[in-house]
Regions:
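Short, well-ordered secondary-structure micro-motifs
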Residues: 54-56, 106-109, 135-136, 162-163
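Catalytic cysteine-centered active loop of the rhodanese-like fold, especially the PTP/DSP P-loop
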Residues: 96, 117-142
């Protein structure tokens, strides 16, 4: 049995760039510590857009160019990948580039991992609680209903504190375990 950690969108543009916030910056150390102490595979997701982002439906609702592939703001904030790769255990570290909030690729990857070595639990951390974290938590609960999905609230931040709390409540109602 294995436990899996999913680190959602801890990218420069989402932490302290175009979409950054003080709340996002405050969780970076917590996320780093969670990674350093995690005994199992870690998957980093990256919000990934093209230069025509503003023409997309998401871009029309959120007209702030961010996380354009291979730009400085698209990269994971310093220290997190290094923390994952520097762990004393030899568990894999992988990446998923996702073009929108929820990722069916993440679900598919976890289903594949589960078929090879059963997953005991999945833990989600990262940004933004009220957009990508909640979207993926619900997808994972729907696709892997018998695997506990944990959300470490000390390692998440929302667009606002109110929307962060609302997302945590929503995930609890959908049988995610919010810590």
């Amino acid at each position: 049995m294995q436990k899996v950690l999913v680190v959602m969108d801890m990218q420069k543009d989402v932490v302290d760039g175009a979409l950054g916030s003080a709340q996002a910056q405050l969780i970076v150390d917590n996320v780093r510590q969670k990674i350093e102490n995690f005994d199992g595979p870690i998957i980093f997701t990256r919000d990934t857009h093209d230069t025509d982002y503003l023409e997309s439906q998401e871009g029309k609702f959120l007209p702030v160019t961010h996380c354009v592939k291979n730009t400085e703001g698209w990269h994971i904030v310093p220290g997190l990948i290094e923390a994952a790769e520097g762990r004393p255990i030899m568990s894999p570290v992988s990446f998923i580039d996702k073009p929108n909030f929820g990722s069916f690729e993440l679900l598919s990857r976890l289903e594949g991992m589960n078929s090879v070595n059963p997953i005991e639990s999945i833990t989600l951390v990262g940004l933004c609680t009220d957009i990508c974290v909640v979207s993926n938590a619900i997808i994972l609960k729907a696709g892997l209903p018998e695997i506990p999905v944990y959300v470490d609230s000390s390692c998440c931040a929302g667009v606002t504190e109110e929307s962060h709390q609302a997302a945590l409540t929503t995930m609890k109602m959908c049988q995610c375990i919010v810590e």
